[in-house]
Amino acid sequence: IEYQEGRAHGLKAIEVKNGPLRFVSMADRALDVCQFEYRGENLTFLSKPGLNGRNQFDTNGLEAQRSIMGGLFFTCGFENICAPYVTPEGGKYPAGSFPMHGRIRTTPAEHVSSDAHWTAEGDYVLEVSGEMREAELFGENLVMRRKITSVYGQPSITVEDEVTNESFRDEPLMWMYHC
């Protein structure tokens, strides 16, 4: 789906229905799950700013408060998971300014795919997957590969994430699911 109005205009997402569950995974926001329903009842929180596409309120200091939407979860990291801070030159870690909850939560997914297939056990499996790259020229290059799986008729989802450092140097890693 693609949202057409307001701050969500242009936001691309994938809607999955497995019988008792309905959820929406945002392709433009790290495949985080923004809506989650069980038998038609909403189980998620939506913050006052509402749904947002990637915009100017993403990665500077406290401006994240203008784009954090809530949802079932959003991914925080990889260089910061809490309040914004600045690392000085000459320290143990690379110098820089790190926004509230990091940048990965606003990173659009690449190589996005959705699939539905039968298993040998007779389960009908629904999957959404993609990868997000948090990178900077001469800096970090961290790639998260995410797969969200649900089995038709079962009231659960499984989120599998793997982060790989594809940089030329060791990188600090902070990672949190904000629920």
PLM features: residue spans?
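Surface-exposed acidic/polar loop and edge beta-strand patches at domain peripheries
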Residues: 1-152, 156-158, 170
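Short, acidic/polar linear motifs in exposed loop/turn regions
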Residues: 166-168
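Histidine-centered catalytic micro-motifs
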Residues: 174-179
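A conserved active-site cap/scaffold subdomain adjacent to cofactor or substrate pockets
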Residues: 160-164, 173
